[in-house]
């Protein structure tokens, strides 16, 4: 995720660091431009990229806010069904599950500190986290297209 941000944790095979060992927000990660093309408009974001296992595990844990046009993207390599939870994530988030062609497969709004699982329901190339309600406020819907240079293509 991104000024002070918050993110969900990918659930499933994890690196050696146990989630219980993460006790504070990770420093902001490098950002990259990303665009979302909706029916009405193109929206431009600068999002943090969680590339490593640890960066993906820590995500937006303990972050207090997500900038309006910020967020965090989690590339899924290999491409797979993504399962996220909100363990130690103190703000609610929108999760956009993105296919290899860039289309949004699913959008969910996850509650803060919820250890329930949000799943993509199908193999995806990436998951984008935005502040809760941001997708709806901008009119972003399932089927809209995400353009990001780092999107895994399969």
Regions found by a protein language model. Name each.
Residues 1-13:
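Bacterial N-terminal signal peptides
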Residues 19-154:
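Compact, glycine-rich, soluble single-domain proteins
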